[in-house]
Amino acid sequence: MKYYAMILFMFAVASCQTSTVVKKLKGCDSLVITFNHPGTDSVLQSVSTTETKAIQKIAGFLDGKAVTPGSCDFNGNMLFFKAGRQVLPVVFKYSSDNCHEFVFDLDNKVMSTKMDNEAADFLKSLSGGKNWY
């Protein structure tokens, strides 16, 4: 019985831990999202916010399953800031159905995480001019 209690405790602790990327972005006070012209690095549009709730929601999107980076074009990037200093730049892909991902450098390691449909829909709405969170 002790053995099962210990395993249950370990799972409970593990499930309560915050991911490394969410920890890194904790306390960020501004975010800039840029959208590129298709197939280029030229900025088509940018959106920024200082709303804590919005920043936390978007930061949570980055906490997806680790994936191998795809070979499609990037659609834009996100820049998270804290007290005027850049904390984490993130590039993203969402326009192709088989290529939804975020790519960022976390503690000198390039990470690529799967973008869920909610995140893709959110970015599509922002690029279309809708500013809702």
Please report, for each region that a protein language model flagged, where it lies by residue:
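Positively charged n-region of N-terminal signal peptides that target proteins for export
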Residues: 1-4, 17
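Function-determining sites in protein domains
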Residues: 16-133
